[in-house]
From Swiss-Prot:
Name the UniProt record assigns to this protein: Large ribosomal subunit protein bL31
Self-association and partners: Part of the 50S ribosomal subunit.
The species this protein was found in: Mesoplasma florum (strain ATCC 33453 / NBRC 100688 / NCTC 11704 / L1) (Acholeplasma florum)
Pfam families (UniProt xref): Ribosomal_L31
Keywords: Ribonucleoprotein, Ribosomal protein, RNA-binding, rRNA-binding
BP GO terms, sorted: translation
Taxonomic lineage from the root: Bacteria, Bacillati, Mycoplasmatota, Mollicutes, Entomoplasmatales
Coiled-coil intervals: none
MF GO annotations: rRNA binding; structural constituent of ribosome
The UniProt record lists the keyword RNA-binding: yes
Entry-linked PROSITE patterns: RIBOSOMAL_L31
Amino acid sequence: MPKKDIQPKYFEEAKFICTTCANEFICGTTKREEMRIDVCSNCHPFFSGAQNFANTTGRVEQFKSKFARKEAINATAQKNSEDQKSKNKENK
């Protein structure tokens, strides 16, 4: 005998909203009534045939900018350290 009420709730008319082109369509899902997606078939290059980029500042770009700032700070700290070492040698 199968257990009762173990299946997830199914939303037959869930609203999907594309965050890139603001296209909306209705489809069934078990997640939630309104879903936001990054790319849909309306704006995806495979389906549209155009090579346009959706989000230019994604996670990778944010990581690269954060890493570049860290490298700049490390370079400044290294330079200050070398300057301090040279001053210490002069004072001896």
